[in-house]
Amino acid sequence: MKTKGDNVFLSGKEVLVMKYIQVTKENLEKEHICCAISNTKDAQVSSKKAWLSERFDEGLVFLKSVERGKCFIEYIPAEKAWNPIETEDYIYIDCLWVLGSLKGHGYSTVLLEACIADSKAKGKKGLCILSAAKKKPFLADPKYLAYKGFKVADEADNDIQLWYLPFSNEAKVPSFKACVKHSHIFM
């Protein structure tokens, strides 16, 4: 990767450097939380911000571009994730999102690399994230995950998959809890 001024050259392609900020309890109220929520006065926004504020105490990290609604990554220690997974010393990525018009410029790579560096600094053994065999809304793109070295760790009957990126060969493979692998409604 070469740089020139504010621009970076990735694979010979010149791209504008995007600046990032970590959202914390201290700046949460003034920051836009680029998510599927567009109206900043909506009750969903205040609910999401309240949820985030509580999760920061559990180790949640929210890293986003300073440009409103462009790209972000949200992750938390897997033991605190709001998903039925079993794993030790992994980081769970709640969301990795880049605005469609900005895809292909390396922004998701920058965010993912920041997550990896932070996770390793915290002594974690790897990352995990939800996806599916075929791309589904609000789930990570399986082609992107495979491209970045993630592998399928487990799959539920509803085709939802748990993907993981171990930092070493000794890292235990995460899994779904038994209650979700074969979901049934009992009457």
Name each model-derived stretch.
Residues 4-66:
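Short amphipathic alpha-helix that is part of the acyltransferase structural core
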Residues 22, 69, 151-152:
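Residue-level detector of beta-propeller blades
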Residues 49-67, 71-90, 94:
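A conserved beta-strand-loop-helix scaffold within acyl/acetyltransferase catalytic domains
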Residues 96-101, 130-134:
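Short strand-loop junctions, especially beta-strand C-caps/beta-turns
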Residues 98, 104-119:
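Conserved acetyl-CoA-binding loop-helix of GNAT-fold acetyltransferases
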Residues 119-134:
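Conserved GNAT acetyl-CoA-binding A-motif
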Residues 133-156:
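Conserved active-site alpha-helix within GNAT-family acetyltransferase domains
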Residues 157-186:
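C-terminal "cap" of GNAT-fold acetyltransferases
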